[in-house]
């Protein structure tokens, strides 16, 4: 509809501004949930990032998820002690990396598929009420395949680190 055309024009303008920066000033570039959904295909209930605080296409993204007690996964993980499942933290990190990789002009409209997880360490728990900080830096890319170095933290304390392999496809 007309609203989609307007949103698309706004995102195209946003991407054009990023494309024209060419490493000039390093000001922060943030995205809200609506803008995130124009880059990656994930939707509720599986969109696990609320905001991107900063990103550079093809290089890195830093995002956040506000972890609410009302998340569906807390009903069964665990009823007596609500803890965010580690695999969902990894997925949130992957989605953050997908923002960095899929915001490249040549990857718009594509999907970043999970290829693997290496060097994963769970170092702490994520609980209801936490603000989960997600950072993924693209450290290798060859054709459609790449690797991201990912770190999740709460209040400055690292809770998960991993290397995430991805493949960009249609």
Where are these regions (language model features)?
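Short, small-residue-biased leader/transition segments that mark boundaries at the very start
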Residues: 1-6
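Hydrophobic beta-strand-centered segment that forms part of the acyl-chain substrate-binding groove
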Residues: 28-30, 97-133, 159-161, 166-167
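HotDog/MaoC-like acyl-thioester-processing domains
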Residues: 41, 57, 127-130, 137-170
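Catalytic strand-loop segment that frames the active site of acyl-thioester-processing enzymes
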Residues: 44-84
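Conserved positions in beta-strands of structured domains
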Residues: 50-53, 118, 123, 135-139
């Amino acid at each position: 509809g007309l609203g989609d055309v307007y949103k698309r024009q706004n995102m195209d303008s946003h991407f054009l501004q990023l494309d024209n920066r060419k490493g000039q000033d390093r000001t922060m570039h943030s995205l809200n949930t609506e803008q995130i959904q124009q880059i990656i295909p994930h939707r509720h209930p599986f969109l696990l990032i609320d905001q991107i605080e900063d990103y550079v296409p093809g290089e890195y993204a830093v995002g956040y998820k506000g972890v609410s007690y009302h998340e569906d996964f807390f009903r069964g993980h665990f009823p007596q002690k609500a803890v965010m499942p580690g695999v969902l933290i990894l997925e949130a990190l992957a989605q953050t990396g997908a923002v960095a990789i899929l915001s490249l002009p040549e990857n718009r409209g594509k999907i970043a598929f999970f290829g693997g997880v290496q060097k994963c360490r769970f170092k702490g728990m994520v609980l209801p009420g936490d603000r989960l900080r997600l950072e993924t830096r693209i450290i290798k890319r060859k054709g459609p395949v790449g690797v991201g170095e990912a770190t999740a933290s709460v209040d400055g304390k690292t809770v998960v680190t991993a290397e995430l392999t991805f493949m960009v496809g249609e």
